[in-house]
């Protein structure tokens, strides 16, 4: 996605965005309208590269009005990766039609029906960093959703929806085994692991929260966890 600034008093409708790689491959998409005096991040399509080149590549992004007239253009840098290496994927969210991304640390072996490890990140951590914190596995794919921005309400509310949208998308793309879907996370992601695990117990074979906190309301209170030790329903290890 890319931000468009409409600094005029009339709406921009029927916009098209053309993305052209440095090798000439191109893709055009009719994108979202931008209302007057508004900044909006809108979707565009990057053409699937047919070359085997890896590393940085340049792309020109051209914004056109509905008549095909050029409004603006910019150049972006992309990292072209092999699907067997750690990489990012995008999808269109059902919440608001926006482009969201998740990171993939793929299995070192080929084939369907492998395990899926959903790893939810801590506060102010990007999915791309989360996925790269793990060594690749030979029996499953590590999938790291990025949430809505770095915090996303502690993986509750809209963060919860993002995590489950990514899970559904990754299951479809990698054709993983639903009986071997696991959930983990660290810090804020540890809280997310508890929250997602108890909200969707039928979706995960096991959960592993790390350095987590059980309750947002108690998170900022001094010695809040220590106060829970005496509660019989919440054993501390």
Please describe what each predicted stretch is.
Residues 2-8:
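Short edge beta-strand/loop segments characteristic of extracellular beta-sandwich folds
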Residues 108-112, 156-188, 198-204:
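Gly/Ser-rich "nucleophile elbow"/oxyanion-hole loop immediately N-terminal to the catalytic nucleophile
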Residues 147, 208-218:
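Active-site nucleophile loop of the alpha/beta-hydrolase fold
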Residues 192-196:
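Hydrolases whose catalytic domains are alpha/beta-hydrolase-1, hotdog thioesterase
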Residues 217-237:
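The feature captures the conserved acid-bearing segment of alpha/beta-hydrolase catalytic domains
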């Amino acid at each position: 996605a890319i931000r468009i600034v409409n600094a005029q008093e009339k709406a921009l409708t029927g916009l098209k965005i053309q993305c052209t790689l440095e090798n000439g491959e191109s893709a055009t998409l009719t994108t979202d309208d931008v209302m007057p005096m508004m900044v909006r991040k809108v979707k565009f399509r990057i053409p699937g590269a047919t070359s085997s080149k890896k590393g940085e590549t340049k792309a020109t992004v051209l914004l056109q009005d509905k008549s095909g007239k050029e409004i603006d253009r910019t150049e972006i840098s992309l990292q072209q990766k092999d699907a067997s290496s750690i990489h990012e994927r995008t999808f269109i969210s059902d919440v608001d039609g926006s482009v969201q991304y998740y990171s993939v640390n793929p299995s070192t072996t080929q084939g369907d029906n492998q395990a899926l490890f959903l790893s939810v990140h801590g506060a102010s951590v990007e999915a791309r960093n989360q996925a790269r914190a793990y060594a690749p596995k030979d029996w499953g794919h590590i999938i790291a959703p990025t949430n809505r921005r770095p915090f996303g309400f502690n993986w509750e509310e809209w963060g919860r929806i993002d995590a489950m949208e990514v899970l559904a998308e990754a299951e479809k793309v990698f054709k993983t085994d639903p009986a071997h879907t696991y959930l983990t996370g660290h810090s804020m992601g540890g809280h997310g692991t508890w929250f997602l695990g108890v909200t969707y117990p039928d979706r995960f074979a096991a959960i592993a929260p790390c350095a987590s906190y059980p309750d947002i309301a108690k998170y900022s209170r001094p010695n809040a966890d220590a106060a829970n030790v005496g509660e019989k329903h919440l054993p501390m290890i």
